[in-house]
Amino acid sequence: MLFNSYEFIFLFLPFTFFIYFYLNKKRLTEVAKGFLVLSSLFFYSWWNVIYLPLILGSMVFNYCFGVELNKENSKISKKFILILGIVANLMLLGYFKYSDFFISNVNFIFNTHIPHLNLLLPLAISFFTFQQIAYLVDSATGGGTKQYDFLNYCLFVTFFPQLIAGPIVHHKEMMPQFANLKNRIINYKNIALGLFIFSIGLFKKVVIADSFAVWATNGFDKAAVLNLFEAWATSLSYTFQLYFDFSGYCDMAIGAALLFNIKLPINFNSPYKALNIQDFWRRWHITLSRFLRDYIYIPLGGNRKGRLRTYVNLMATFIIGGIWHGAGWTFVFWGFLHGVALVIHRIWSELGFKMNKFLAWFITFNFINITWVFFRAKDWDDVLKVLKGMFGLSGIVLPNFLEAKLGFLSKYGVGFDGFVERVGDRNTFLFLLFGFILVLVFKNSAEILKQLKFEIKTAIFCSIVFIYSIFSLNNISEFLYFNF
């Protein structure tokens, strides 16, 4: 079930909301929690019920391991239990997500012909795997998981607003909210805030992101070759599509959770305003950055083992981050590039160099935009097609109306024709300009939410945004991070 679907907005969400609070009103607290877990599992099963046993088995397995890790006088080594638990989780993720990638590489290296398994990736497996690994690690290190019962644990893992594509929540920020007595009563302020931010997220997805998606798809998947302007229109369209799609999803998740008086962590903080790559990762997919830092980078030694080890740890962390996103060498290389950029930034900072703010932003944004090409491309041919175009190696074409004044450029190989016809039209660049204005000038959703005043004009604005988005739900599309 998609957030941007009629059945979710007009059936599932209101039904779940009213039944949950009705049960709480009758002081059937545990029943209400159980209902919310069952509703979340129904929400998860909407795509493919065949994987329902997978998430159920995963929860039972990890909860039991957590209980064992919390025992003070366990007969089995905690280190052994933790390693076994982490390995089991990673093997499950690896089997479904990376089997065909592994087989492809074995076939290439050894010239074999092992058939692919062609497994359907279980929804949200990357997210609930990381979430539960963090739980196991904290259970082993005294991270305050001892008091959780199985029902609360299930609610922590399955709570439907964050289940499918994050944010990657931590038990310490979720469990106390589920236990808070005040959160069992309808809070009209939270309803207003939730509906507002949900509407903003819906608008981001169906009006903005899905518009950019058309041009990104044309460039990456349909065009055989791209000239300079087409290539830049393609890469920038995907850069904005990904941001508005994923941040739109997170806004909708935050809004839906607020209806139940649950505050999810902020996952985006105007990442395209970043002035360096470290700043970007403090603003983009914040909960993933937190997980990578706390459960990979710091356990590897962080910055406590000397400069060289710090650089190696940064590289390893972001290569793992790349692999987590997808089973392909383009994802690995994307993670590698970000690791290299972070190492260069650290060296630059250690040397005490400074840079003009605009230049710093320009370099950072273009690095991010170029590396998203590796993230989006289906294979290396698509990468080369887009990058060749971006660097002018596939020709430069200007609009026909400029030929009268700039015709002399034709002797230098510049053509005059429909300069973005394989991707979009002139409106594409107007929309890209609109995208830049939105991400660089306007406040982000979290900032708006903090300063929101309950006024008539706010209600009117929210209503217009919501209604316009609803009427734009002609072609319902999945969120991009559902594939990760």
For each feature predicted by the language model, list its residue ranges:
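Membrane-embedded transmembrane alpha-helical bundles that form the catalytic cores
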Residues: 1-439, 447-483
